[in-house]
Amino acid sequence: MAARDSDSEEDLVSYGTGLEPLEEGERPKKPIPLQDQTVRDEKGRYKRFHGAFSGGFSAGYFNTVGSKEGWTPSTFVSSRQNRADKSVLGPEDFMDEEDLSEFGIAPKAIVTTDDFASKTKDRIREKARQLAAATAPIPGATLLDDLITPAKLSVGFELLRKMGWKEGQGVGPRVKRRPRRQKPDPGVKIYGCALPPGSSEGSEGEDDDYLPDNVTFAPKDVTPVDFTPKDNVHGLAYKGLDPHQALFGTSGEHFNLFSGGSERAGDLGEIGLNKGRKLGISGQAFGVGALEEEDDDIYATETLSKYDTVLKDEEPGDGLYGWTAPRQYKNQKESEKDLRYVGKILDGFSLASKPLSSKKIYPPPELPRDYRPVHYFRPMVAATSENSHLLQVLSESAGKATPDPGTHSKHQLNASKRAELLGETPIQGSATSVLEFLSQKDKERIKEMKQATDLKAAQLKARSLAQNAQSSRAQLSPAAAAGHCSWNMALGGGTATLKASNFKPFAKDPEKQKRYDEFLVHMKQGQKDALERCLDPSMTEWERGRERDEFARAALLYASSHSTLSSRFTHAKEEDDSDQVEVPRDQENDVGDKQSAVKMKMFGKLTRDTFEWHPDKLLCKRFNVPDPYPDSTLVGLPRVKRDKYSVFNFLTLPETASLPTTQASSEKVSQHRGPDKSRKPSRWDTSKHEKKEDSISEFLSLARSKAEPPKQQSSPLVNKEEEHAPELSANQTVNKDVDAQAEGEGSRPSMDLFRAIFASSSDEKSSSSEDEQGDSEDDQAGSGEANFQSSQDTDLGETSSVAHALVPAPQEPPPSFPIQKMQIDEREEFGPRLPPVFCPNARQTLEVPQKEKHKKNKDKHKAKKEHRRKKEKKKKHRKHKHKGKQKNKKPEKSSSSESSDSSDSQSDEETADVSPQELLRRLKSLPLRRQ
């Protein structure tokens, strides 16, 4: 027994590391808690942790990486000799031993690689790959992938294998018995000899009987349905050129060169592989790297039995036997289907064996001759006194009015309608207003008090309106005052009468709005039963009471809102200048010339606009540019008032133009343009000779000046000219000297006007501008002559206008206005132009000062030429040339300059000291000169 026990002890198998035996009396050690445990390395030394929470790496003396100095740069070692021994470092070369351990970030484990895996071919994987290749945009593209990268199983296959799935089995619950062979369909007839009763089916059934019940089998491996989403722009079931069918053919077509050597070729276009070769592109002409071994001879498998040796009739069909031809069906039914449907059938679909029953199409119904596609239902209008006009219109359009069927039916009438037909008086309902409970005397007393208060309010309003009319009569023109009074009367009448012309609370219901208007009319007349009269007798008592409350509430609301608005707003004290609007000054001119230039396609200067724009001073500072108008107070475009375009401006246009209105308009323009004389000339100031206006623009400007209403607050000069206007027209045969004396005493302007015209300020300005343009005069000779001519016209126009203000009108009849206007046009460069002259001797008075002005201009040109010669001679003097000529010409220049200066100073002194009478005498004595 002892031996047996010892043998049994020796046969025991021990697992794990045994504990050290404890000595007698020694207690077992307690486990060390987690916080007291330490980490040691292989040699038993304590390990220090260097991380983010314990100081990180250290490069000092202690605990350094390699040396006392810490990191040291490695010396350069040439790798030319041992270049072949150089190995590429990977991440594992930089890891610690802890990272490569079992609990590290890259533990080492023994794993079976693909090289040592099973060599059996995975059919499921191949079918999936071929399905992917067939549905790809380029079929057969996976052939190149097989050549480049090896195919690997996905995660799904790995999971299935770990769950117990094996290659070649299906996915799903296990079955107990093998599936029996499918029995033939009883509806299908089988021709030929019947099989003997004892066949393989019986033996298979007998084999199944011997199998135990607890044995299960894996389901059959079935290729899953391809649920690939359509993510391309091709049509349904579109496939490009399949290289399997094009190069190698399929089993059901004309012939297949590789059918003998490939037994595994399926519908997916699987290519049979000879000699265990890899999939690849076969070809004799080009080499493709690793596939440059000798290819199979495809012509060695050909036999002459596949070709016809006897001439015979052509086979039915179109003769297209290539791989692109549609498939030919064997039996007649399929050929009929082929004729009916040409194309490829989608995967999962098949042609129907029975045709669809054709739908019977019925002909459309026959329309009558008088049929109209749109039917118009004529309105049914009852014959009452209120809509007699509507009934008449309907009878004229349709021939007769449609009677209301409700009036003849007894079922359509209610009690109120029957009472109305019988002529009975409607029964009054209960009182819904507090006023109806009052007695008759109290109602009359309230009415008298209301009339008294209304009368006092009307008297006070009339007094205030009369006072306002008297105070505003001096400020308003007669037409505007008449319109203002009529507007006040209309406003007072609207306030006194409670008429809601614009206030329609029941606009959606015309009948109700009509009753509400009748209620307001009765209320204005002061009738007591206004509400009861306007209500519809066909309504019920509840509806009548509700409508009575709505009418009273609406009238109260309108009265309160009307009184609130009238108390908050008042009439205007001053008249709005409705006949004029402010527009930019440069836009005031007529744009007819520009439009005509655009029509003629003459683009350029004629279609461009130049505006005078005054920038803000802060803007000039920000952009660091000088202010072009330092003395200007305007910002933006200068604006002037212009008449509104209206038909009424031309209704009161007289045949001949009169002098006072023109003078008043010019004085008005001078008041607007007075403080802006120092500005630069703009397009507004250009003369009409340069603009070349047509007769239409002249007519418009004349109509504006004539249609402008005269203001009462005009200057005294205009009033005096208006008083003397009839004298100029009526007393044309009076003596010339008497008229001159009366006109000079009555309408003599101030001396400022004479100084502005005859002083040398304009000459100085023109001379300074000519000096500035002196260097470029040779290049701009044409423009200088034009400016000189325009300045001559300006001076002549100003002189003639003042002379006409002093000289009386002669006895000869005045010429027409447009001709005179074209002769007296001037350039408005230094302010507004003066009124035109209406006298026959205007041309003479215009030509009188032309000679003197022409002489002054000649003197200016001479002085300018001499100044230019002086500069040239100074240059020659610096070069020390022509000294003798310079000495001879110096006294001549000094004498000529002194004479010109003295003449200018004398002329200035004479013009400053000459009296107005002497000036008139000199103007009369000047000789006339024709140009």
Swiss-Prot record:
Residues 896-905 have a biased composition (Low complexity). One of its GO terms (cellular component) is nucleoplasm. Residues 852-888, 922-931 have a biased composition (Basic residues). Residues 1-41, 73-92, 169-209, 568-595, 659-931 are annotated as: Disordered. Pfam families: DUF1604, G-patch. GO terms for biological process: mRNA splicing, via spliceosome. It comes from the Eukaryota. There is a cross-link at residue 312 (Glycyl lysine isopeptide (Lys-Gly) (interchain with G-Cter in SUMO2)). Residues 769-780 have a biased composition (Acidic residues). The modification N-acetylalanine is found at residue 2. This is G patch domain-containing protein 1.
